[in-house]
């Protein structure tokens, strides 16, 4: 089925191909994952008022983009209990190729100075981390990978005029398994063979994408398939370098780091751009207020 998917050939032709080609054996550990259980459904807040406020006012993302993500079911607001404290959180949802919920990441709204990053950040237990959180623009024929969903929304807002027929994917970290799954998903969609993905377990994702690289010309024929829009830091660069050195054609789209900071992500770029724009507007208003008032005098019409 895998050979038929990638090469678009018949069953007999696939058998002939497998009998002729010398393949390197790989040891794959079989591990069936349990279905993901989502415990927050009954305590979701459909209004998402606090989530909207945090994403627009604190993160600088436009109301229009936040609304799109809410409408597609990728963002909801819920309550989360930590020890004896209940707090509102934003839930970012991950759906697979059958639009079944596979994972959920939580983002705290209120600051908590006892936490390392000041706000709650966690992934729900039992999440299938190989899927990622995806958002489609048009009919996707290429993939753009970000580290977080907030970065994904920021990247979308900054580039929306030039983004067509693309799937934006949040890896929720730096996960090669997400790159493998989403690549196989795109190939399966192109060949109308989504049923193939139903049979693939997570431990087979990397061996399968490596086989495509080694035995087909798929990546040669699709040089613009993969874009990494990860953070501009040591971890992001290391992840990108390793993927490129593995023989995959990868276009690198790091956020600008003109100030030479240790880490810059796409949300940093978005907020800085909006801050600069706001400063320009305030300066223009101040200039207009300080302009001298024109004196007018009456004249007689002859």
Protein language model regions, located:
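Non-catalytic accessory segments of DNA primases and related replication-initiation nucleases
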Residues: 1-58
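Terminal peptide-recognition signature
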Residues: 3, 55, 92, 99, ...
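Short active-site loop/helix that positions an aromatic residue
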Residues: 5, 152-160
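Basic, glycine-enriched DNA-binding surface that flanks or lies within the catalytic cores of DNA
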Residues: 33-137, 161
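Short, glycine-/Ser/Thr-/acidic-enriched flexible segments
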Residues: 97, 150, 233-234
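Short active-site oxyanion
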Residues: 139-143, 224-227
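Conserved mixed alpha/beta catalytic, RNA-binding, or beta-rich assembly cores of soluble enzyme
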Residues: 145-148, 173-175
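TOPRIM fold recognition
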Residues: 159-302
